[in-house]
Amino acid sequence: MKLNEIRERFIKFFVNNDHEQVSSSPLIPEHDPTLMFTNAGMVQFKNIFTGAQKTEMKRAVSSQKCLRAGGKHNDLENVGYTTRHHTFFEMLGNFSFGDYFKETAIEFAWEFITKELSLDKNRLSITVYHTDDEAYEIWRKISGFSSDKIIRITTDDNFWSMGSTGPCGPCSEIFYDHGSPNLQEGDRIVEIWNLVFMEFNKDEEGNLHKLPKKCIDTGMGLERIAAVMQNVHDNYDIDLFSALISKSQEYCGRTENKIAHKIIADHLRAAAFLIAEGVLPGNEGRNYVLRRLIRRATRYIHLLGYNDSLLHRIFPVLIDSTSSAYMGAELVRAKSLIETTLKSEEENFKDTLMKGINLLEKFTTDLKSGDTLPGESAFKLYDTYGFPLDITLDVLKEKKINFDQKGFDDAMGEQKERARAKWAGSGEKSVEQVWFDLINKFGKTKFVGYEFNEVSDAKILAIVSSKNEVIDSAKEGEKITIILDKTPFYGESGGQVGDTGSLIKSDRSIIIVENTNKVNDLYLHRCIVKFGSICKGNTVAASIDKERRQTLRRNHSATHLLHFTLRKILGDHVTQKGSLVAPDRLRFDFSHNTQMTQDQLFWVEDMVNSLIRENLSASTKIQSMNQAIDEGAMALFGEKYGNQVRVVKIGDSRELCGGTHVEHTGEIGLFKIVTESSVAFGVRRIEALTGQEAINYVRDNEINLKKVAEFVKAPVSEITSRLSILSQEHKKSETKIKNLYKKLVSAENIKSTEINGINFISHTFTDIPANVIREFVLQQQKPKTVIAFTATEKDKTVLIIKVSKDLINKISAKELISIAVKKNCGGNAELAQTGCDSNKIDDAITAIYSKITASKHSTSYHHEPSYRRGANKQRDT
C-alpha cells in the first residue's frame, strides 16, 4: 500500500467515525514563541487542550506536516544513519476534545490497524504506563493479548506532558515486529502509534489533578507505517523515498553510500516544504535551518562525485510522489520558486564547501581514529569561512575523530548567545491569556463589517485596561480595549490594518477607536475615552471611519490585481511573502530573485490600470478549502485556513482572503508604483499608491519637473538633453578646477626636514580638496621619505601620510597616523588617511616627528623641525 493511500485511508476511517477533517497547520507555528517549527500533530490544538481556546469541535483527524531540524527537537544529525529518522515527516492523528476517551481511542486504533490495514496481530505488542490498569484491561479485552504482549513501562516514556505544568497523562504505544533476525533490536521492533490519554493537570508542585474534560491525542508517523505496509525495514525504502533515491543514484552514477542518498532525499523534502511556506535561506532562525539542510545535502552530493547542482533536478520526483495530496499542491504552486532557490543556494555554496573541506583535511591530517579535533579549529571554519558545523561533524564521524564541543562553545561565546536569542522560537509575541479567557467566556465576535459600516446596538461585553486587566468601567482620558458582541470594525489581519472610528453612547459619551486587532476571531477595539464614561453592559452606536475604509478597500483590491499581474508577467514562481494594506499606500513583498527592469514595472502598471479601467466586478464566496484550491484560488503560504474559506474573485484573480474590497475595480481610480526594491534574498518589494494618493504623487512629480525645467531653462520635454549638456559642462569645469588646484599645490613652498637620512616632508594646505592632495601624495616616489600633509577645506581637515616603499618594513603609515590622532585608524604600511582636529595639526605633526626620531634609524642628533610655524627655513623639496 503506497504512502498516499495510507494517508487517505486514515483520514477516511476517522471521518466515517464522526471526526472533522482538519487541514495541516503550517510548519511555522502561529502565536507560539516556544517552537521554531510545528513538530507534532497536537500543536495546532494546544490551546484547546489547555482550555485557553473554546471549540465546538468534539473530534478531529489530521495529517500534519512536522519538522524536527532546529530548536529543542532536532533529528538532523540522525538522518541517514538510522532507518527511521527524518527532518520532515507527516504525523497522522485523531483527537478528542472532551468526547471519547481510552476505550474508544483504543478501539479505533485496533480496528484501523487490524482491519483497515490488516496487520498481523502476532507482530504487534502494546506498552502502557505501569499504573494505568484501565488501559491495560481495555487492551486485554479488545486485543485478546496475554500479559507478555501488553508491557507495563515504569519510565516517563509512557507518561506524556505538555510541559513542566499543565495537561498530561499516561500513554499507550503500539509496536510492530519486522521479524527479521538480521535487524538490530531498535530497527526490528518499532513504535508505530502513540495514544496519549490526557486526564490530569500537573501543578507547580508536580501534583496531578483530574481534568474536567479528558482528551485524546494520538500520533502515527506516516513514513513508519508505510514501511510496515510495504514490507520494508527501512523508511527510506518506501515508495516516496525510493523514487527520490533512485533519481539521485541515476544522476550521480553511484548506488553505494546509502547514507548519502538518504540525506539528500530527506533534506530535499524538508527544504522544499519550507520554501513553499515562504522560508528562504539566510543566516538566522528558520532561514538558517533551511540553509543548513540545503548545504548538508550539497556536501553529500559532492561526496558522491556529482559536482553540479542536483537538488532542483530531483525535485520534480518529489512533486510526482506527493501531488495527489493537498500538501503536494503546495509544492506545485511554489514549483518555480523552490527550484530557483535550491539551485541558487547550491551554486552559492560550492566555493565555501570546497575551501572548507580542504581546510578540514589540513586540520585532521595528523589526527587518527579516536583523536579529537580542537573546538577552535571547527569554530574557525564556521566563523571565518561560513562552513556549517553539521558538515564538520559529519566528516569527523566518517573519520571516527572526536569533536571538542566545549572548545567550540567557548570560542563561540557571546556571538553564539546572540544568535541563539534571535532564533530560539518563532519570534512572535505570545498572546495574553486575558484574550483567551474572554473568548472562552463570550465566544467569537460577530463581524458585520462586510455588509455594514455602522451598527446602532452593539453591546459592550468587556473592558480591558492598558495593563490587560478586566475592568467594569472607564472614564475620560483612559486608554482601554473594548469587546463588543458584534462589530463593523475590521480587525487587523491578512496585511490589512484595522479600522478606526467611534463608539457613541446614548448620553453622548464618545469613545474613539484608534485601532482594531483580532485574536482568534475575538475583535479587540483599542480605544480612548474622549468624553464621558463607559461601562460594561452599555449599548453603543459603533461607526467606522467610512472614508478611511474606502481607501483600504481600494488598496486591498489593488494588491490582488498586482499579485495577479506579477504572476502573469514574471511567472508562476511569484508568491506573496508579505503585505501591508494601509489607508495611504500598499506594500507587497513577493518571491523573485532579480531586480525588475523598468520595462517590467511599466508593464505591471499598465496591466493593473487596464484591469481597473475594465471596471471588473469583485465577488466573494464561502467554499471548502479543497474546492477553492481546485478552482485555482491562491492560498498564502504560512497562513492557517479552516475547512471553509472566503474566496475573493476579481476578474481572473482568485485569492483566499478575509479583507475588505471594492465592488468594482473602477473605484480604485489610478494605480502607481512608487518603488521596487530588495527585502531579502529572493524577495522583492513593491510600494504603490492608488486613488487620490496616486494622483497627488503624479501631480507632485509634475510640479517638480516644471521647477527643474525652469531651473535649467528648458521645456519639460527637453530636460534630459539639457541636463546631459550641463553634466558634460560640469565635468569639463571640474577638470579645469582640479588642474588649477594641482598648480596651486605645486606652487606651494613645501619644505622637508632630514632626520638621519630620512626625508620628512610636512605641509598644511588650505581650501584645497583632500582628493587633490591625496593624488599629489601618491605621485611622490622619492626614496627614504615620509610625507605628512593636512588639507583643510570647509571646516574639515584630513591628514594623509605616505611612507616610501623602502621604509615600510621599519616605519608604518598606519602606525604613524594612529599615533598622530591618538586613535586606531585604517590604511596600510605605505598609505593612511583620516580626519583630524584642525586645532591639533601641530600636535599631530610633532607626534609623527617624534616617532621617526625615536626609530632605530635615528641617532642622538637633534635640531629644530621645519614644520613648526616660524621655524627656520630648511631646504626646498
UniProtKB/Swiss-Prot annotation:
The keyword Disulfide bond does not apply. Its EC number is 6.1.1.7. Its main location: cytoplasm. Binds 1 zinc ion per subunit. Keywords: Aminoacyl-tRNA synthetase, ATP-binding, Cytoplasm, Ligase, Metal-binding, Nucleotide-binding, Protein biosynthesis, RNA-binding, tRNA-binding, Zinc. The keyword Cytoplasm applies. InterPro entries: aa-tRNA-synth_II/BPL/LPL, Ala-tRNA-lgiase_IIc, Ala-tRNA-ligase_IIc_anticod-bd, Ala-tRNA-synth_IIc_core, Ala-tRNA-synth_IIc_N, Ala-tRNA_ligase, Ala_tRNA_ligase_euk/bac, DHHA1_dom. GO terms for molecular function: alanine-tRNA ligase activity; aminoacyl-tRNA deacylase activity; ATP binding; tRNA binding; zinc ion binding. It is found in: Cytoplasm. PROSITE patterns: AA_TRNA_LIGASE_II_ALA. It is an enzyme of class 6 (ligase). GO terms for biological process: alanyl-tRNA aminoacylation; negative regulation of DNA-templated transcription. Signal peptide: none annotated. Its cofactor is Zn(2+). GO terms for cellular component: cytosol. It catalyses: tRNA(Ala) + L-alanine + ATP = L-alanyl-tRNA(Ala) + AMP + diphosphate. Zn(2+) binds at H556, H560, C657, H661. Consists of three domains; the N-terminal catalytic domain, the editing domain and the C-terminal C-Ala domain. The editing domain removes incorrectly charged amino acids, while the C-Ala domain, along with tRNA(Ala), serves as a bridge to cooperatively bring together the editing and aminoacylation centers thus stimulating deacylation of misacylated tRNAs. HAMAP family: Ala_tRNA_synth_B. Belongs to the class-II aminoacyl-tRNA synthetase family. Catalyzes the attachment of alanine to tRNA(Ala) in a two-step reaction: alanine is first activated by ATP to form Ala-AMP and then transferred to the acceptor end of tRNA(Ala). Also edits incorrectly charged Ser-tRNA(Ala) and Gly-tRNA(Ala) via its editing domain. This is Alanine--tRNA ligase. The lineage of its organism: Bacteria, Pseudomonadati, Pseudomonadota, Alphaproteobacteria, Rickettsiales.
